UniProtKB/Swiss-Prot annotation:
Substrate binds at residues 149, 181, 216-219. Catalyzes the formation of N(7)-methylguanine at position 46 (m7G46) in tRNA. The active site is at residue 145. It catalyses: guanosine(46) in tRNA + S-adenosyl-L-methionine = N(7)-methylguanosine(46) in tRNA + S-adenosyl-L-homocysteine. Its EC number is 2.1.1.33. This is tRNA (guanine-N(7)-)-methyltransferase. The lineage of its organism: Bacteria, Pseudomonadati, Pseudomonadota, Betaproteobacteria, Neisseriales. Residues 1-20 are annotated as: Disordered. It holds the Pfam family Methyltransf_4.
Amino acid sequence: MTDTAENQTPNDRQAGHPRSIRSFVLRQSHMTAAQQRAIDTLWDSFGIDYQATPADLDARFGSSRPKILEIGFGMGMASAEIARRLPETDFLAIDVHGPGVGNLLKLINENHLENIRVMRHDAVEVVKNMLQDGSLDGIHIFFPDPWHKKRHHKRRLIQAPFIAKLLPKLKTGGYIHLATDWEEYAQQMLEVLSSFDSLQNTAADYAPTPDYRPETKFEARGKRLGHGVWDLVFKRIG
């Protein structure tokens, strides 16, 4: 779900950083009139513009409920459903894919969801500059681009340097939940998360899919192709 498009906010295109890890892929895509209308009319209520200074998430949401960061949400269907299932939890959903941003805003409005805020920016920069240490109760990264060719593995999001940046943002007792339909990437994810002494696997290796996570289009696609799906849930213990 982090296999996304143009890195721009609704008001301003952001510069790329090709030599660093990014949470997205630059691709052209078509935005429907309904998606654009959702951005135009709902962004002020549910969108958060990027800033290079720490943000007060409780103030942005208007609540002190637990906060979950979601990196990459595709077209937003799973994000909206998770928020519907967990109304007492706030979700900060980040993606750069314009149609997906518009579609998630549309779903937020249609389902009367008050516990999601949306950002359209590189999640790596958001994590680095906007999120305060200890501000998150959980992190969801579902079906990031597997970059299946070996020469492209260095572009994968789930690498030790990025996890090291995420960990300080997570409260002790908070969790990281990853999911992929690419077995070799699942093995890499397991190795990366297991390498951190401050993270504890909640399962022997791969976890049962938690009840809150619905089947995504990426998961359905993988099953059609005969792929398995692997969930990993690690808890911060220190």
